[in-house]
Every structure is written in C-alpha cells, then in structure tokens.
C-alpha cells in the first residue's frame, strides 16, 4: 500500500511503540496515587510535560495533556473563555478552521456567546485589516489555525498575535498540523494557547496536549477536577503521553531533514504534473501565501475528487478529498468556500500529504494513476466530439 494521507494520521513509529509497551508494563500506576507506583507514573508524566514544553519554547506548567486535537481545541477555548470577565463574551474564529473548532463555536452560541466567523482574503490569509472590521470591545478570544489541513496555508500568527494583544484580546492557535512539522516557539508566535496532537507525528492515537501561558487565567470546564491540574478529568494516560513525547522528540530531531525531503518531493511532483500536462492545479497561491511543504491541496479538473480518491484506492494508493473528520460529508468544504471556489471546483479537490516513509517512487505510481485517468477522460472527450460531429452532419 502507498500511503499519501499523512495529514489525516500517521503510523506509530517504533520508538513510540516501544515506550508505550514499556510504560504500560512497568509504569501502570495512577499518577494521582500516593504510593510508589503512582509516584513513578507521576515522575514520567512531569518529565513528558517538561519535554513537550521545551519543544515549543514554553513553560512546563502550561502543558496539559488531553485525548487529542479535538479535545485540545475544545478545552482550550472553553477554559480561556471561562476565565474571562462576563463582559468579554465575543469569540472570533475563521471559516477555514478544523471541524472541531466549528463545532465548538456552535456550542458556544448555544451557551449565549456571540460568535463571529471571519473569511480570509482571496489568498486564504487572515490579515490585521480583516480582524479590525470584526473586533469589538467585548471580544475576548480569537482562535486561528497555524496552518490549514487541506491547503497547507500557514497563517501569519506572529503578526496577528501582536495586533490582538495590543487590543487586550487572547489568541488560541490550533497547531495540530504544524507541531513537529515546522519549528514552533510559543514566545515568538505570541500565542496564549496552542493545541497539539500525537497521531499526526507518528505517536499513538488518543493523546494530545494544550499549552496555555502560565500567566493567562482560565477556569476548568469540568468542575472539581484534580487531574491535569484541573484542566481535564479522568485518569491520565501515562503510557500514551510517554509515547507521544518519544514521537515528538524524534520528529523534531529529524525536522530539518524532513522539511528538505518534503520540499524535494513536492517539487518533483509538481514538475511532473507540468511535464505530463495533467490538468491539476494548486488550491493555494504559493506566491502569495506560505504553505506547509508536505501538504498538496489541488484540483484534478474534469474529475470529482471522490472519484479520483476511489480510483487511487483501487490502485492501492491512499489520498484524501480533505479533512478526515468531515469525510462523511459530500459537498464543498468550508475551506474551499472560504477560498471563493465554485462548487464544481471544490468537488474536484484532492489532498496529497507526505510523511517519513514517502518516496519519489511512490509519487511516480500516483502520477501514473493520474495519467491513466486523464488518458481515459481524453478518450471520452474524443468520443463525445465524434458523436456530436456525426449528429450535426446528419442534421
């Protein structure tokens, strides 16, 4: 099988799996228990907290472990809003966010919060000017993704955070697609909170983390909770967190090399698209917006993305038509709508995403599949033209 859907999830690496197995066998104590088994688990937990904090340039006291990106987003947003004055009940997010953010926004509206969903500019970027038109005195929190999971477009978070802080507004950033893929420093970005996920970086599923600056006030979603310093209820998954940390340390150690590999693979793929005259165009204008090199969101014109994905699957190649969390929905994604794509264009969208095990040979197989599909389609066009020509002659 050729797997080219790393933006959806990744296979667990051997290092993380080894740590998970060892901790499951040797450090099975509840980290909240006062006996030695609990103390050993607590020591591992705090060690992992320190390591994850170091990776993002944060403080260990600001790291809270969760069950993954979706829960990280929800708990971060809700906890920050809970900590704000009652006069700050206006929440802003963008049309291009992960579905978990949209779901959270809908839930906030049910609680009586005022929610504004802003559109990016034509290049998929949120600008200071766009924020300016929507910020109000009661705006308390803004949530903007670091990079889009479908297009790879990276938002200018550092610039936006400075602007928001000057207005006294907190900024949460969903960094699930960028953590471990590009350098992240919370101080440089200027974010107040950051969401991360394990299974996007070759760690186990069911684990994630939130970083909240220690000086930022928040109040828990779950009342009377003691786990994770009151941030999240339930017995802490120490083996999963240990494996997540092992995966994070490994991927960060390989980051520079992997970025170069991804850039080379991306260049090769796009060059071959042009050489073969395939009707494939990028969803993002890379001359106007910086993009993650391992994500190629594109349109295969004359084909529905779902059809291309299924044909690739028949050839034992895994690609995507967008976010896996919205895979059951057959229609234009919110990101495509935000980029002003027509419904026809949006339905032609496919996503190819690279990872640690991706090779040029695998991309060659994908290109071959694309070429076969296009040759078949051109043959159909020729038949249609002949039929129409014969019809005109008979008339």
UniProtKB/Swiss-Prot annotation:
Cofactor dependency: pyridoxal 5'-phosphate
Gene3D superfamilies assigned: 1.10.260.50, Aspartate Aminotransferase, domain 1, Type I PLP-dependent aspartate aminotransferase-like (Major domain)
Enzyme class: transferase
Chain positions recorded as [2Fe-2S] cluster binding sites: 325
Superkingdom field: Bacteria
Annotated InterPro entries: Aminotrans_V_dom, Aminotrans_V_PyrdxlP_BS, Cysteine_dSase, PyrdxlP-dep_Trfase, PyrdxlP-dep_Trfase_major, PyrdxlP-dep_Trfase_small
Induction and repression of expression: Repressed in the presence of nicotinic acid.
Record EC number: 2.8.1.7
Entry GO MF terms: cysteine desulfurase activity; iron-sulfur cluster binding; metal ion binding
Pfam families linked to this entry: Aminotran_5
Keywords: Iron, Iron-sulfur, Metal-binding, Pyridoxal phosphate, Transferase
Positions contributing to pyridoxal 5'-phosphate binding: 69-70, 177, 197-199, 235
Sequence positions bearing N6-(pyridoxal phosphate)lysine: 200
Residue positions of the active site: 325 (cysteine persulfide intermediate)
Disruption of the gene: reported phenotype: Cells lacking this gene require nicotinic acid for growth.
Swiss-Prot/TrEMBL catalytic activity: (sulfur carrier)-H + L-cysteine = (sulfur carrier)-SH + L-alanine
Function of the molecule: Catalyzes the removal of elemental sulfur from cysteine to produce alanine. Seems to be required for NAD biosynthesis.
Family the UniProt entry places it in: Belongs to the class-V pyridoxal-phosphate-dependent aminotransferase family. NifS/IscS subfamily.
UniProt xrefs under NCBIfam families: PRK02948.1
Annotated PANTHER family: CYSTEINE DESULFURASE NIFS-RELATED (PTHR11601:SF36), CYSTEINE DESULFURYLASE FAMILY MEMBER (PTHR11601)
Protein name as annotated: Putative cysteine desulfurase NifS
């Amino acid at each position: 099988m050729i797997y080219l859907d790393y933006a959806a999830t990744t296979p667990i690496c051997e290092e993380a799996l080894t740590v998970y197995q060892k901790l499951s066998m040797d450090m099975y104590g509840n980290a909240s228990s006062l006996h030695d088994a609990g103390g050993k688990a607590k020591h591992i937990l705090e060690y992992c907290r320190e390591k994850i904090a170091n990776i993002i340039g944060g403080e260990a006291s600001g790291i809270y472990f969760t069950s993954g990106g979706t829960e990280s987003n929800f708990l971060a947003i809700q906890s920050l809003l809970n900590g704000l004055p009652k006069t700050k009940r206006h929440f802003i997010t963008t049309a291009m966010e992960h579905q978990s953010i949209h779901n959270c926004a809908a839930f906030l509206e049910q609680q009586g919060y005022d929610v504004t969903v802003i559109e990016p500019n034509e290049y998929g970027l949120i600008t200071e000017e766009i924020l300016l038109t929507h910020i109000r005195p009661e705006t308390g929190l803004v949530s903007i993704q670091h990079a889009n999971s479908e297009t790879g477009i990276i938002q200018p978070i550092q610039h936006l955070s400075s602007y928001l802080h000057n207005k006294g507004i907190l900024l949460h950033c969903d960094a699930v697609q960028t953590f471990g893929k590009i350098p992240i420093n919370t101080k440089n970005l200027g974010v107040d909170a950051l969401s991360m996920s394990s299974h996007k970086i070759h760690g186990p599923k069911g684990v994630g983390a939130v970083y909240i600056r220690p000086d930022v006030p928040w109040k828990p979603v779950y009342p009377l909770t003691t786990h994770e310093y009151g941030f999240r209820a339930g017995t802490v998954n120490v083996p999963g967190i240990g494996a997540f940390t092992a995966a994070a340390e490994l991927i960060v150690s390989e980051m520079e090399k992997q970025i170069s590999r991804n850039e080379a693979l991306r260049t090769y793929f796009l060059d071959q698209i042009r050489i073969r005259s395939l009707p494939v165009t990028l969803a993002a204008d890379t001359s106007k917006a910086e993009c993650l090199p391992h994500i190629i969101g594109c349109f295969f014109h004359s084909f529905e993305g779902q059809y291309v994905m299924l044909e690739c699957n028949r050839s034992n190649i895994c690609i995507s038509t967008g976010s896996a969390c919205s895979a059951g929905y057959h229609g234009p994604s919110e990101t495509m709508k935000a980029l002003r794509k027509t419904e026809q264009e949006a339905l032609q969208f496919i996503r190819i995403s690279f990872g640690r095990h991706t090779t040029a040979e695998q991309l060659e197989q994908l290109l071959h599949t694309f070429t076969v599909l296009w040759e078949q389609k051109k043959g159909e066009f020729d038949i249609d033209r002949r039929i129409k020509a014969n019809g005109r002659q008979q008339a």
